[in-house]
Structures are given as structure tokens and as C-alpha cells.
Amino acid sequence: MAPVAAAKIPTEWHQTGMAAKAVSSRLRASIYRALDRAGPCSRRTASRFFRYCYCSMAVQGKQGSLSLPPVAKEGLAMYNQNRKEGTPMNIVVLDGGTTNPGDLSWEPLERLGRLTVYGQTPQGLAVQRLEDAQAVILNRLSLGREEFSRLPKLRYVGTLATGYNTIDVKAARERGITVCNVPHYCEEAVAQHALSLLLCLCNKVQRSAGMVRDGHWAQAVEESHLSLSPVALAGKRLGIVGYGSTGQRMAALGLALGMEVLLFSRREKQAPAGCRWVGLETLFQESDAVSLHCPLTEETRGLVGRKLLALMKPTAFLINTARGALVDELALAEALDQGRLAGAGLDVLTQEPPEPGNPLLSAQNCVITPHVAWAAKEARERLIRIVAENLRRYQEGRPQNVVS
């Protein structure tokens, strides 16, 4: 057999399997041989792994000279070892109560190993509860370099969320620990919640309902033409910062209400009629409501501060269902209390739960919900299903949604 020609597999995980179709049968044989070296596996497992090649696989000159990426090799080796020895993977869910308070099933994860579920875990007990864990599933707890150094058996971290800012991804990568998130599971629920916050502010729901509860029905009716006058959204401008899947759904809701939608994102993409791409400052200047749907990164931390808030109309609203640290909370509270902003609807804060002295807790026209926009039952069911699928694919040596 002639030497296998050098080949380059794209560095991204190919769920479509297009990479497999472009590779010769000789390279396929080389992949099988490399898999055999990683551990005994069925032809079916090897074929599945081949179709979803992960990272770079370099074929060097001689036939059969192929190296598997460490993350795939480790996952496949662990899967084969556990299968051979008949020992299931130790899987620990540290704070399952935030996702499943008892109304859902953990069965998708139970099928993958020996599962231990804690409803809540104090941060100080995390390492103790993970001493024998090979895989951990968590939502809001933090795992950093110190914790990883004390957990030699840990090989996998799965987040019960899209965001993973509580995980030190760099430290995990250095220790060969794979981290996976769930990028798409609650877009509809979060967009719906963002709209509900906006409608609550526009229709003065909290204040008018409170007046009725306190026995001031007639006064509430009288003020409905004055301070309690609703704001009609049709014809107004909705600014959306971040045009990912949730931002796109929020845009669709705005269009359905007859609003013009202004968009800002790192990368512009095709948008429906009624949407217009603008610069960030223009968006804050021209919008009657601004809704944040961008990720929290070093570049976006504190994005909405005094400068952008000063550009907003005094009749405008700010909605944040993304991450609390996107907003300078002191600057926002000052803008609300000084009447430079009509209202804010927040589902997220920089610190959760907030300290009693957080100025937003007493700010004028500020509606705060406790980070529950994502929590629709349908979204949580989807979340558990994808978390289990992430782990299953890691066990088979073909991980998905890898962020480490």
C-alpha cells in the first residue's frame, strides 16, 4: 500500500459529517488503526468517531501514522475502559435543584453512569463531593484552578447553562478536562421574559396593581391618564444588542408588535424586513427600549455604563436578561433615580442574590426578577436532554459543544 498522503481535517467539530465524505478510504483505515491503539472498540464506534472527527488529525508520510486529539482519545479510552471493566462513570450533579426541583427526570443522565444528584452544594463542599467524580454537572457553582488541582479523577465538566463564566476554562484545558455548555435551549423562554419585563414597564403593571391591592382603585383609574398612562410600543424603536438566537427571537417579537428594530452585534448577518443594523451609540440614542442579549466577555463587562446611559432618551427603557455584569449597576440606579431613564427591567444582577445595599433594589421604576427567564419547564427538559447528550458524546470520543 502506498503511503497515506498528508491530509488536514478542519479544526472544528463536524456534526454534518462532511469531513468524512472528503477523506480517502486509506485515511479511514488509518483512523481505525489509531482508534484500536486508543483502546478496543467496535467498528460501529470507530465509524461514528470517524464521521465526527474532532480537532486536527495529522497524517505524516507513513501509512497509519495518525495522532488523535487528546480530548477525543481520553473520552474514548474512558468509555472503553468502563465498558470493559463493567464500571460505570461516576457522575455528580452539584446543584441540580436550580434546574430540576423535582418536576423533571434525571433519567437521561442515569443511563450514562452512576449518578449522584445534590439539590444544592455550598461552594466550600464542592471539592469534597467531587473526590471520586469523573464527570460533574453544575449550574451556578464555580470551579477554578485550585479546585481542579484537588480533583485528579475529574475529566469532564458539563454546565447546566449556556454561560460558563463560573468555570476557569483555561485551567480546565491545561489539566485535560473537557468543558461543555448548552448553547441553545431557552431562546424562546428568555425572549418571552424580556418582552414581559418591557410590557410590565410600559403598562405600569406593578404600580397600578399595587394601588388596587391597597384599595385605591379610583385613584389608579384617574392616574391612568397621567403618571400611569401606558406606553404604546407600535411605531417605537426596539434596540437589540447581540443578535444570536435569543436576540433574533426578541427581534421577531418586536416586529410582531409593530416596532422598528435596531440591531448591533459583533458580526452582522441577514435580518428580516423591519430591522436595521446600526452602531452601538446610535442604537442607544435612537431606541425607545434597549434589550441586551450579548454574552459576558472581558470586552462586554460593564458595557452599559454612564456613557451609553447618557445617550438614551429619558423616556426609554433598558431590559437585561443576559448577564448582570454587562451593566454598571450604580450608574443605572443613578439614571433611574434622576429621571434620565424611564425604567429598567432586569432578570440578572452582577451578584446573585444581591447584597441588601444594591442601589437597584430601591431605584425608581426598576423591575427585578431572580434570574428565572430561562426556567420554563419545556426549556429545562431540553436542557437536561442536551446535557446528557453532551456527556454521551464525550464518552464515545466525539464531544460536542466544547468550550475548553
Language model regions located:
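An N-terminal-biased, well-structured beta-alpha scaffold segment characteristic
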Residues: R83-C180, Q285, G305
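N-terminal Rossmann-fold NAD(P) dinucleotide-binding loop
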Residues: G247-Q248
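Intrinsically disordered, low-complexity segments enriched in small polar residues
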Residues: G17, S24-S25, S30, G39
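NAD(P)-dependent dehydrogenase/reductase Rossmann-like domain
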Residues: R382-S404
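Glycine-rich Rossmann-fold phosphate-binding loop(s) that bind the pyrophosphate
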Residues: Y243-G244
